[in-house]
């Protein structure tokens, strides 16, 4: 059976057909509409899936935000242009006439990355560092979603009580500092207004402020990982997302994690499925993989 998998992120929407063998084909992308109106996201999803839906038997959606009863509830509305709520499953079933499921994108990615691990691993955590910071936790071989869908939203744990206000309403969240949006928001002077991609480019060219911003992000993530190790005693942490997979970033995180006491060290791995982990994880869950 073929699954039409959809990944809704803060920057882009992706869709692909995924067979029972896990092979991805006909992958497509569109920019995520920066709009508070549900109609804008519905129209973008319609354009994304219409060329693919005739070739699928079901739909699996991985989306940023809390997924509860098939709907998206934005914990940080800024990541979706201010959109607060969207009925994912209902909308995709209306658009495609196919049975649909929805799950948080980082939770889905965690499940895909867990399947790719070698060795006797039962406990792992996936972290995505992109427009925002999200996560997924596998404990005892089971994916944790939580009764309200909040499990794994580690980007909204405290990093700095005197830090910037996060879009979720808290002050000093990891996401407000370490994410691509957080990196860009802290830029000053000639870097003010630059996006994270530009800041990474400038850092590679030797720009001191750009390098400091990226180090600040990596140091914040390393401290988060130490906290995660203390909380879950996971066997490894897998890092993905556009920032997490940027050249040289994971090495910085490893450097800062090494400065923590040894009890909080844990193996760090780059995401095996790169930017397709959310799509694949959603498809796996739609195929009936047990949580």
Swiss-Prot record:
Its EC number is 2.7.1.60. Keywords: ATP-binding, Carbohydrate metabolism, Kinase, Metal-binding, Nucleotide-binding, Transferase, Zinc. It holds the Pfam family ROK. Pathway: Amino-sugar metabolism; N-acetylneuraminate degradation; D-fructose 6-phosphate from N-acetylneuraminate: step 2/5. InterPro entries: ATPase_NBD, ManNAc_kinase_bac, ROK, ROK_cs. GO terms for biological process: N-acetylneuraminate catabolic process. ATP binds at residues 5-12, 132-139. Zn(2+) binds at residues 156, 166, 168, 173. It is an enzyme of class 2 (transferase). GO terms for molecular function: ATP binding; N-acylmannosamine kinase activity; zinc ion binding. Catalyzes the phosphorylation of N-acetylmannosamine (ManNAc) to ManNAc-6-P. Belongs to the ROK (NagC/XylR) family. NanK subfamily. Homodimer. This is N-acetylmannosamine kinase. It comes from Escherichia coli O9:H4 (strain HS). The gene is nanK.
């Amino acid at each position: 059976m073929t699954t039409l998998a959809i990944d809704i992120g803060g920057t882009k929407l992706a869709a692909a057909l995924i067979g029972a063998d896990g092979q991805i084909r006909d992958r497509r992308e569109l920019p995520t509409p920066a709009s508070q109106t549900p109609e804008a996201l519905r129209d973008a999803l319609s354009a994304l899936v219409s060329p693919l839906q005739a070739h699928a038997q079901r739909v699996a959606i991985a989306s940023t935000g809390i997924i509860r009863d098939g709907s998206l509830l934005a914990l940080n509305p800024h990541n979706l242009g201010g959109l607060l709520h969207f009925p994912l499953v209902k909308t995709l079933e209306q658009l495609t006439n196919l049975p649909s499921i929805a799950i948080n994108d980082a939770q889905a990615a965690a499940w895909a990355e867990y399947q790719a691990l070698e060795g006797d691993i039962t406990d792992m955590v996936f972290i995505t560092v992109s427009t925002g910071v999200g996560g997924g936790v596998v404990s005892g071989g089971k994916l944790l979603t939580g009764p309200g869908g909040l499990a794994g939203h580690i980007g909204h744990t405290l990093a700095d009580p005197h830090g910037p206000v996060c879009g979720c309403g808290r002050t000093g969240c990891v996401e407000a500092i370490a994410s691509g949006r957080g990196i860009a928001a802290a830029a000053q002077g000639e870097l003010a207004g630059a996006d994270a991609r530009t800041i990474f480019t400038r850092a590679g060219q030797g720009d001191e402020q750009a390098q400091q911003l990226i180090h600040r992000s990596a140091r914040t993530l390393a401290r988060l990982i130490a906290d995660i190790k203390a909380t879950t005693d996971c066997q490894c942490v897998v890092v993905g997302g556009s920032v997490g997979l940027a050249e040289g970033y994971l090495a910085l995180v490893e450097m800062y994690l090494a400065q923590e006491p040894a009890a909080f060290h844990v193996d760090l791995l780059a995401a095996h499925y790169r930017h397709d982990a959310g799509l694949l994880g959603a498809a796996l869950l739609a195929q009936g993989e047990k949580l």
